[in-house]
């Protein structure tokens, strides 16, 4: 779409869409769940075990122990030994939804934990292999969560739920594992950059990585949009300037879903941006396949962050 017709302009300004409708049309494609959480027996009088696995809603937010069960669709690439490094639990958002969380201990004693907000058409089961591979290669542990309506998280996906979901996951990571903000690298991919930018604009952390980010929902739907309207959704462009932590922006020059111009615009608007990574020829879903992706992440986390703290 190269511009807005008179009819489209009339529709926008006479009957503007609400942000929730823009968000729903642009972003949310939750897959069929590729995993389940199985409660592990808790010691108790008479050897009482855990509640039935179907009782997830009632147990959301409790400190019970859970075991990850991956379905074949998750396409897990590692052995049982690696699977055993994955801890899963449930927490509850301020909007009342059960949020599924995952902590992957890739590197004992790792300096940083990457807090990963994933893309729009995957869940934790599908991402688990990637998290193990990423963490071991960049020497970090990985924490992630599923948005409302994804995986075993309850509720429906929405912009408001995105913000509540990441808040709940942030608090769970900090309280459950005692990890301080200066040891957390917030990482958002695609739609995951929306909650990541929102959280990073409100809390300081070690660093932020924005992978194939969008400036706003309207700018994705209508590329010639130059300003942020009150009915826009996902207004990253209005929040990124409030981030006080170092920000690495990664984008493919041939991104067919979120145009490369979005990454450029956010880079220009972000006062804390470091040297970006523009991956020549990469699209929306294949940046990780290029060697410079891991090289840039390693340099950012192992060299640039420690030097900034010195």
Curated annotation (Swiss-Prot):
The modification Phosphoserine is found at residue 307. The keyword Disulfide bond does not apply. It catalyses: S-hexadecanoyl-L-cysteinyl-[protein] + H2O = L-cysteinyl-[protein] + hexadecanoate + H(+). Coiled coil: none annotated. Keywords: Cell membrane, Cell projection, Endosome, Hydrolase, Lipoprotein, Membrane, Palmitate, Phosphoprotein, Postsynaptic cell membrane, Synapse. Palmitoylated on cysteine residues located in a cysteine cluster at the N-terminus which promotes membrane localization. Palmitoylation is required for post-synaptic localization and for depalmitoylating activity towards DLG4/PSD95. GO terms for cellular component: dendritic spine; endosome membrane; plasma membrane; postsynaptic density membrane. Gene3D superfamilies: alpha/beta hydrolase (3.40.50.1820). InterPro entries: AB_hydrolase_fold, Hydrolase_4. It is a lipid-anchor. Its EC number is 3.1.2.22. One of its GO terms (biological process) is regulation of postsynapse organization. It is found in: Cell membrane; Endosome membrane; Cell projection, Dendritic spine; Postsynaptic density membrane. The active site is at residues 190, 255, 284. SUPFAM superfamilies: alpha/beta-Hydrolases. It is an enzyme of class 3 (hydrolase). GO terms for molecular function: palmitoyl-(protein) hydrolase activity. PANTHER family: ALPHA/BETA HYDROLASE DOMAIN-CONTAINING PROTEIN, ALPHA_BETA HYDROLASE DOMAIN-CONTAINING PROTEIN 17A. Belongs to the AB hydrolase superfamily. ABHD17 family. Hydrolyzes fatty acids from S-acylated cysteine residues in proteins. Has depalmitoylating activity towards NRAS. Has depalmitoylating activity towards DLG4/PSD95. May have depalmitoylating activity towards MAP6. This is Alpha/beta hydrolase domain-containing protein 17A. It comes from Bos taurus (Bovine). The lineage of its organism: Eukaryota, Metazoa, Chordata, Craniata, Vertebrata.
């Amino acid at each position: 779409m190269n511009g807005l017709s008179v009819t489209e302009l009339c529709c926008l300004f006479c009957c503007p869409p609400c942000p929730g409708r823009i968000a729903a049309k642009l972003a949310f494609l939750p897959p069929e769940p590729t995993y389940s959480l199985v409660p592990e027996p808790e010691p108790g009088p008479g050897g009482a075990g855990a509640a039935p696995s179907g009782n997830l809603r009632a147990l959301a937010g409790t400190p019970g122990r859970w075991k990850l069960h991956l379905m074949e669709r998750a396409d897990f690439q590692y052995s049982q030994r690696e699977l055993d490094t994955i801890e899963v639990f449930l927490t509850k958002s301020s909007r009342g939804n059960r949020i599924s969380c995952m902590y992957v201990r890739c590197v004992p004693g790792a300096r940083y934990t990457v807090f990963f907000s994933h893309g729009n058409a995957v869940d934790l089961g599908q991402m688990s292999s990637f998290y193990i591979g990423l963490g071991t290669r960049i020497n970090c542990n990985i924490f992630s969560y599923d948005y409302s309506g994804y995986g075993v998280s309850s509720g429906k996906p929405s912009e408001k739920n995105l913000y509540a979901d990441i808040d709940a996951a942030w608090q769970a990571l900090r309280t459950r594992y005692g990890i301080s903000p200066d040891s957390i690298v917030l990482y958002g991919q695609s739609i995951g950059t929306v909650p990541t930018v929102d959280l990073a604009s409100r809390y300081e952390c070690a660093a932020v990585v924005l992978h194939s980010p969008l400036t706003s929902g309207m700018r994705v739907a209508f590329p010639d949009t130059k300003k942020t309207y009150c009915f826009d959704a996902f207004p990253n462009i209005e929040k990124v300037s409030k981030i006080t932590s170092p920000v690495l922006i990664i984008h493919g020059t041939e991104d067919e879903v979120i145009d490369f111009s979005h990454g450029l615009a956010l880079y220009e608007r972000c006062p804390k941006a470091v040297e970006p990574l523009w991956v020549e020829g990469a699209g929306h879903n294949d940046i990780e396949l290029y060697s410079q992706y891991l090289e840039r992440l390693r340099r950012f986390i192992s060299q640039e962050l420690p030097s900034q703290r010195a």
